[in-house]
Amino acid sequence: MEPLRLADAESLLSETSVIPLTPPAQTPEAYYTESDDETAADFLVRMGRQQTAIRRRRRQTRAAGFVAAFVLVALISGGLGALMCWLAYR
């Protein structure tokens, strides 16, 4: 078994490596500074509302996906049933 060796700088960075120069941008609603007129409690209330909206949107998307999947299964089932009837009675 070969001993583990530490990665050197050349193996970590290559010509195709992409290193972001700035951190990923946050949504403008998700910041809090003491200099704002907003208190910490107001910030937490706002973040709670945002998280509730995100959860609601996720739930609605999941429900729409289930409905679409159910409709697709029903259409496939109906199509196969029609095909079987057509093949059986022709």
From Swiss-Prot:
GO biological process, one term: intracellular transport of virus
Superkingdom, natural source: Viruses
Transmembrane segments: 64-84
Keywords for this protein: Host cell membrane, Host endoplasmic reticulum, Host Golgi apparatus, Host membrane, Membrane, Signal-anchor, Transmembrane, Transmembrane helix, Viral envelope protein, Virion
UniProt organism field: Cercopithecine herpesvirus 1
InterPro entries cross-referenced by the UniProt entry: Herpes_US9 (IPR009278)
Protein family according to the UniProt entry: Belongs to the alphaherpesvirinae envelope protein US9 family.
PTM comment, free text: Phosphorylated on serines within the acidic cluster. Phosphorylation determines whether endocytosed viral US9 traffics to the trans-Golgi network or recycles to the cell membrane.
Membrane topology field: Single-pass type II membrane protein
Protein known as: Envelope protein US9 homolog
Native organism taxonomy: Viruses, Duplodnaviria, Heunggongvirae, Peploviricota, Herviviricetes
Motif (Di-leucine internalization motif): 12-13
GO cellular component terms listed in the entry, alphabetical order: host cell; host cell Golgi membrane; host cell plasma membrane; host cell smooth endoplasmic reticulum membrane; membrane; viral envelope; virion membrane
Annotated compartments: Virion membrane; Host Golgi apparatus membrane; Host smooth endoplasmic reticulum membrane; Host cell membrane
Residue numbers on the Virion surface membrane side: 85-90
Protein's job: Essential for the anterograde spread of the infection throughout the host nervous system. Together with the gE/gI heterodimer, US9 is involved in the sorting and transport of viral structural components toward axon tips.
Disulfide bonds: none
Residues exposed to the Intravirion side: 1-63
Region (Acidic): 29-38
